[in-house]
């Protein structure tokens, strides 16, 4: 067996990506402080044909060299929009019948492995700040809370790992 070269991977170019049918998922970043994490989210969103990313609050926006370092050009392919207030984004998404899901540890959260998607339903996954998590007001406004099960000594995963 041999490793494939990049030229053999049959990937989409930026125009093909923009024109392609997307996965019915939107990512909402609620006050993410690390530019490297933001870039990693863009790269993951590109890999999974995610429809759009909302960058909210203090979350930095492209172009920025530290975002570009981990995004590797995905800021050109993945649609994104900045919004000052995450709650405003949630309200807009709900009006479009998109189910809002905060990824957080909270009362009555559903474990990720127990969550079942429904056909023809679109989802917005909300990821929070590296220290404080998803803000309480956003958790309260979300339709569902999903918790990623963890069994070690740490209380959380890095956001770029959680998004993946």
What are these regions (language model features)?
Residues 1-164:
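Post-transcriptional modification and biogenesis factors for structured RNAs
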